[in-house]
Regions:
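Membrane-interface helix/loop boundary segments of multi-pass membrane proteins
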Residues: 51-83, 87-100, 134-141
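Transmembrane alpha-helical segments in integral membrane proteins
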Residues: 47, 51-64, 126-151, 190-205
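Interfacial transmembrane-helix boundary/kink motif in multi-pass membrane proteins
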Residues: 1-15, 28-38, 62-78, 179-188, ...
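Functionally important transmembrane alpha-helices
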Residues: 74-78, 82-83, 100-102, 107-175
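Alpha-helical transmembrane segments of multipass membrane proteins
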Residues: 5, 9-13, 77, 81-88, ...
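Membrane-helix interface motif
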Residues: 18-23, 87-98, 160-166
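C-terminal membrane module of polytopic membrane proteins
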Residues: 150-218
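Hydrophobic alpha-helical transmembrane segments
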Residues: 40-51, 108-128, 180-193
Length: 218
């Protein structure tokens, strides 16, 4: 269910961009190439989501949840998850001095210095982190968040492969976003609706008392 939900939600964004003439199907790729890309992208999505879910929902959220309320643990882990995606990878310093560490940190955080490049992407990623934490809380396992996460990563990696830009968005770019897919308000809205659906679906499920990274709290 998680993988299907993740893939369908962002497939809806892609279909809307095609339907409104924002992007077009990239017919330059053969069907064999499309299939090959889909297999590779899905494999990469599963691998990345597995590692990130173990870290952010398994270790970070799980550790915080043992000490704090769900709200505090979810907000903290979701904020960290969103911020990390905007960290830059600075070049290695030519020489090391007493201030090298702070200089490297400033370069890493430079991706957060331009609000137009940060919003609404950071809100979308924060909403994703919050939903995945909720799924972890309600199921007591990482399988559902792992599936959702893999479905979203698949489209983040495939959006520009399956489609090509057709229109000059201009001021509409705030709504549709760029080729990254996650930086448009449409994607944020779809993730928000997806969150409401899963929160409602899991709302009546009994809250597990404990969970390990992939199973139940010890």
């Amino acid at each position: 269910m998680g993988l299907t939900g993740g893939m369908m939600s962002l497939a809806f964004v892609a279909l809307l961009s095609l339907g409104f003439g924002i992007r077009t199907w990239d017919s330059a790729h053969s069907w064999s190439l499309l299939l090959s890309h889909a297999i590779r992208a899905l494999g990469a999505a599963i691998a990345v989501s597995f590692m990130e879910e173990l870290l952010f929902r398994g270790v970070v959220f799980g550790s915080l949840r043992r000490q704090f309320s769900f709200t505090t643990a979810a907000l903290s882990s979701a904020t960290l998850y969103a911020l990390v995606h905007f960290f830059q990878r600075p070049e290695a310093p030519v020489s090391v001095g007493p201030w090298t560490g702070l200089e490297m940190l400033a370069r890493m955080l430079s991706g957060l210095s331009q609000p137009s490049q940060v919003f609404p992407g950071i809100l979308t990623l924060g909403a994703i982190g919050g939903l995945l934490a909720w799924c972890r809380e309600r199921t007591g396992a990482l399988w559902l968040p792992l599936g959702l996460h893999a479905g979203w990563i698949f489209w983040f990696k495939s959006y520009t492969f399956f489609t090509a830009p057709l229109a000059n968005l201009g001021r509409q770019s705030w709504w549709w976003g760029s080729a990254r897919l996650q930086d448009g308000w449409l994607t944020f809205a779809v993730i928000a609706v997806t969150s409401v659906f899963f929160v409602g679906m899991l709302g009546n499920r009994k809250n597990p008392t404990s969970a390990t990274p992939l199973g139940h709290f010890p």
